[in-house]
UniProtKB/Swiss-Prot annotation:
Subunit structure: Homodimer.
Superkingdom classification of source: Bacteria
Keyword terms of this UniProt record: Amino-acid biosynthesis, Branched-chain amino acid biosynthesis, Cytoplasm, Leucine biosynthesis, Magnesium, Manganese, Metal-binding, NAD, Oxidoreductase
Protein's gene: leuB
Source organism phylogeny: Bacteria, Bacillati, Bacillota, Bacilli, Bacillales
UniProt: substrate binding residues: R94, R104, R132, D217
GO molecular-function terms, A-Z: 3-isopropylmalate dehydrogenase activity; magnesium ion binding; NAD binding
Binding site for NAD(+): 76-87, 275-287
Location of the protein in the cell: Cytoplasm
Name the record gives this protein: 3-isopropylmalate dehydrogenase
Length: 348
């Protein structure tokens, strides 16, 4: 079997971190004996510059045919038209591929707890995943309107939309430490009342998973005061957007965090959580670990290569533990150095 991968380098530092990661993929495929082919497509601001829109039909169709999609980063101050922004291409891609589940791991690597803005003893051993519903909720709700006197947004969830994201979270929790925290605002929101009801019903199908409920404001506090207590957190779109960004600073750098977006049966999208960082683009100083860890997620989830994913992650964790990092993590290496060291480790 030959896996079909679509590469979307995007904007800013996206091309350099993605292209370097693809060089690692070539080494890994030879080592673990699997085949793949890459289709490169412009996306985001780069696509606006070339084609006048952030996501062309050609690119979208290629993504629909793919086994996996790897995205570098998009956006930047260059693209200011509110009706034609790079981010609109990503929203359209998620919706078109029905990428309803966003998976965001947060791991504090051994030896790197000093990088966290929190006390070391508070974050050591943190290993959690936030499962965020991605295609419904207040970001997509209708009706919505805005004028100088009034603005309206609509927060709507159906039972089916809640059930499918909750099943993803339960299955993930069952494969990890067996603990699921469901986040809502059940004390004031009707949508959260339905959310909690559905979570309790679905929990009957997963007796091996312990479930607890937290209001979103309480969860935001516990993420700071005791992040180690969490295993898997599941939440609706807006809450997940906020909480996953909060959790991402716990390890000390946005550059350490990967993410994946899943549908039930279509291609999955893998990308680092950081932005395009146009101020450092082309300077060979970008931290590529988030992109490489996203590649590891792709190896495990879409390319059926769990051993390769484990090896790649362990090499990264060992590098971080021994201070072999870029400047944002306190090290002295540049982007190329990171890829060269990992290439040597993988070839060993």
């Amino acid at each position: 079997m030959t896996y079909n991968i679509v590469a979307l380098p995007g904007d800013g530092i996206g091309p350099e971190i993605l292209n370097g990661s693809l060089s690692l993929l070539e080494i890994i495929s030879n080592k673990y004996n699997f085949n793949y082919q890459i289709e490169h497509h412009e996306f985001g601001g780069a696509s606006i510059d070339t084609f006048g829109e952030p996501l062309t039909e050609k690119t979208l169709n290629a993504c629909k045919r793919a086994d996996a999609i790897l995205l570098g980063a998009i956006g930047g101050p260059k693209w200011t038209d509110p009706n034609n922004r790079p981010e609109q291409g990503l929203l359209k891609l998620r919706k078109s591929l029905n990428l309803f589940a966003n998976i965001r791991p947060t791991t504090v690597v051994k030896g790197a707890s000093s990088l966290s803005p929190l006390k070391e003893e508070r974050v050591e051993g943190t290993d959690l995943v936030i499962v965020r519903e991605l295609t419904s909720g207040i970001y997509f709700g209708e009706p919505r309107h805005f004028n100088n006197h009034e603005a309206l947004d609509s927060l709507t969830y159906t039972r089916e939309e809640i059930e499918r994201i909750v099943h993803v979270a339960f299955k993930l929790a069952a494969s990890r430490r067996g603990k699921l925290t469901s986040v809502d605002k059940e004390n004031v929101l009707a949508s959260s009342k339905l959310w909690r009801k559905v979570v309790n019903e679905v929990s009957q199908l997963y007796p091996e998973v312990t479930v607890n409920h937290l209001l979103v404001d309480a969860c935001s506090m516990h993420l700071i005061t005791n992040p180690k207590q969490f295993d898997v957190i599941v939440c609706e779109n807006l809450f997940g957007d906020i909480l996953s960004d909060e959790a991402s600073v716990i390890p000390g750098s946005l550059g350490l965090s990967p993410s994946a977006s899943f549908s039930n049966d279509g291609p999955r999208l893998y990308e680092p959580i950081h932005g395009s960082a146009p101020d450092i683009a082309g300077k060979n100083v970008a931290n590529p670990f988030g992109m490489i860890l996203s590649l590891a997620m792709c190896l495990r989830e879409s390319l059926n290569q769990p051993d390769a994913a484990d090896e790649l992650e362990q090499h990264i964790y060992n590098m971080i533990e021994h201070g072999q990092t870029t400047a944002d993590l306190g090290g002295k290496l540049n982007t190329t150095d990171i890829f060269e060291i990992l290439s040597q480790k993988l070839n060993h």
